[in-house]
Amino acid sequence: MRYFLEMVLGRLVNHPDEIDVEETSDDRGILFRIRVNPEDLGRIIGRNGRTIEAIRSLLNAASRDNRRVFVEVEDGEGPS
């Protein structure tokens, strides 16, 4: 699933070489923390958060074993 997320993000941003995805897992589900070039934050989040919500929906639909998937985008000031 991490590869899928990195592939989607790579197509959205202008600086694909600066994508950093950190994955952690526990009994509640899987957490992906995304860090990108500050210029690409708007492209990842989208208008009114629509793009990041679509990414979250895709990851939850692709999740195996019905595990929840959480996605946080970090902007240098912490997760959002």
Model-identified regions with their sequence ranges:
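RNA-contacting regions in translation and RNA-metabolism proteins
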Residues: M1-L41, T51-A54, L58-S80
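Glycine-centered tight-turn and secondary-structure capping sites
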Residues: I45-G49
